[in-house]
Amino acid sequence: MARTTPIERYRNIGISAHIDAGKTTTTERVLFYTGVSHKIGEVHDGAATMDWMEQEQERGITITSAATTAFWSGMGKQFQPHRINIIDTPGHVDFTIEVERSMRVLDGAVMVYCAVGGVQPQSETVWRQANKYKVPRIAFVNKMDRTGANYLRCVEHIKTRLKGTPVPLQLNIGSEENFKGVIDLVKMKAINWSEADQGVSFDYEEIPAELLEQAQEMRMSLVEAAAEASEDLMEKYLGGEELTEEEIKKALRLRVLNNEIILVTCGSAFKNKGVQAMLDAVVDYLPAPTDVAAIDGLKLDGVTKDERHASDDEPFAALAFKIATDPFVGNLTFFRVYSGVVNSGDSVLNSVKEKRERFGRIVQMHANKREEIKEVRAGDIAAAIGLKDVTTGDTLCDEKSPIILERMEFPEPVISIAVEPKTKADQEKMGLALGRLAQEDPSFRVWTDEESGQTIIAGMGELHLDIIVDRMRREFKVEANVGKPQVAYRETIRETVKDVEGKHAKQSGGRGQYGHVVIDMYPLEAGKAYEFVNDIKGGVIPGEYIPGVDKGIREQLKSGPLAGYPVMDLGVRLHFGSYHDVDSSELAFKIAASMAFKSGYMKANPVLLEPIMKVEVETPEDYMGDVIGDLNRRRGLIEGMEDGPSGKIVRALVPLAEMFGYATALRSATQGRASYAMEFAKYSDAPNNVAQAVIEERKSK
């Protein structure tokens, strides 16, 4: 079967935003205008097409990143049909992992901002992730019809808060209840969308006289930004020549693709104005798969570099970026094809697990409706049914040309709770449910506490774990009791200790055991986790026993000698030891290494680390003193304050241990008028009194 849409006319985009910027409504309008859904689903009546889990409809927030395919030929049918794959990304900070995952497989993004709230904390997190994956992006300032809407303040925020270079493509005509439409600064025409057909038809009109001067100034800035794309254009511009509409668009596109500028559009998705022009901007300025650099990977040896270009003619390579459980067909594996073609029925290699997988049925999703297709080609996104052993981040590829595409990195959870099934019948179902949920979500972990025998679940925040427990109840019919949230403390060392010895010798009769190591232990910079350096000279320990030493240390890192928490940012250098021809074994060296670790660790000034959260509170000015006082009592470090849309914004770093129950406390202190958002910032040394209390509590257990 030949390709129906040339790859140059594909756009793989994410629509990303802060929790209440109106992203789901924006996506709904996209689906409506592209002719996919004929009735616009409103979020506030719980009927939106993209929010397809029951809980999302109840809470009015998007949790699962659903992928949808739509076609767009332009507001005035000026383009050939373009295929737009939309990945809907959640805006709540506890689901940052979903955003991270989708950024990995996107080519471009639309950042939706609220015209009233401007750039909010979660927007910064998403921005950092887009920077990390070098995703070109445009902005859509939504909710222009709301009281307090201010388009140019939002443009300013992109510069000051996100350190981006915003270039407005449009100027708004009126705002709040007088929001009428926008001025297209490239065409220098006003766009007026018809209210009779929900904004499907529109007219170009002359720019209102009172806005003409401002529009001309903004157009000059736009043309200047375009001229900076090349020396030729700059010469033409400085020489006083007019740039053509085509030259301007081509130049702006180039600068967006190079991540040099952010083009800004505006509108009100709810009032059916502006989304249409934003879709035109997606086609005009965001990349096709062929505009993006080839994807890097490694051969199966894990060392030799390899790459794949966006072409049907290269060997098949795809990345599984999401696993979802579907009530009708079981596991759905969402994947992005980077190169080649795959047909239903084909066998492929999961190169990360080195296992064969067979593509049974392949479907393309429109929110929660699905269409079966026979093949998927380079640049496309689809979901496979029935893959056996695939997790998020695995590579699926041609068996004859294996490649491992770069793996995604997932953050460590910062909060854990114990869960217990309510009845014996729930016991077995709970294990299955948690296993399935952990497969879907790599930022969620499950394990059994060896001392208490309890099942522990861990995640990125209280809301994250609430939703996991809620999904167990709804989707798997498992009732569970939930314990008190626990903070995920860590341990590390602050000093270097040299020549620490560990000797394991049992040599009385028969075959004995003998292992002897001498190591140095030293602190690593934050985020380096662990390193093992083998500095053995002259074969004093044979090569086959070295992995045993590494394993012995790694096992000790799981539970540090200080308080039994995982150890991070620690390095070990093995530089001397001895062995016995008959009695030595890998196991003996593993035991010797763990003995050395235990004896050296407590001499290396071990410290307890606690997770610190970045907290941002938006509060009316009258309550500012109370909010700051409360954050100080919670051991918070106030980083700064600024004016927000409805009062003041306070930014602080606060230990997670002090943030439990904060939502309730903030509500009562401000009569429900303040709101807050928080995300993990870093681990740092817990003060002595806190560390002592935690260590005592651990020992008493």
Curated annotation (Swiss-Prot):
Coiled coil, from the record: none
GO biological process terms held by the UniProt record: ribosome disassembly
Location in the cell: Cytoplasm
InterPro entries for this protein: EFG_II, EFG_III, EFG_III/V, EFG_IV, EFG_V, EFG_V-like, EFTu-like_2, G_TR_CS
SMART domains (UniProt xref): EFG_C, EFG_IV
A molecular-function term among this protein's GO annotations: GTPase activity
Keyword terms of this UniProt record: Cytoplasm, Elongation factor, GTP-binding, Nucleotide-binding, Protein biosynthesis
Primary location: cytoplasm
Classification via HAMAP family: EF_G_EF_2_B (MF_00054_B)
Descriptive protein name: Elongation factor G
Species in which this protein is naturally found: Aeromonas salmonicida (strain A449)
Gene: fusA
